């Protein structure tokens, strides 16, 4: 379909790759179109940590991870997914895009920093243990 629509210049399907940092730093947008059960999709967090905005379907924790830094669309909604991709493509290279990239990276530091998460879990465990 990519070839038929003459989009090969713009879209690359990479498959499995061991050098995530290099890949994430080399892409403009990460799109995750899942229709069921992703739990905590690590690749979304990895993308955002590299400053790559994400377009995700509202499955598992994807919408929580992305927050307002990217786009969240309903699962099994190809038209809405296409609209989100189109919006992102028009935004690339603008000041708004730069802010979006920075917000994605900042959200990872604020919400998913391992030391902050450990403190939060410890606090929760302490509260649960205290109630017993």
Stretches with model-predicted labels:
Residues 58-72:
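Short acidic/histidine- and often glycine-rich active-site loop of Leloir-type glycosyltransferases
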Residues 31-32:
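A short hydrophobic beta-strand element within the catalytic core of glycosyltransferases
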Residues 53-56:
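Short hydrophobic beta-strand element within catalytic cores of glycosyltransferases
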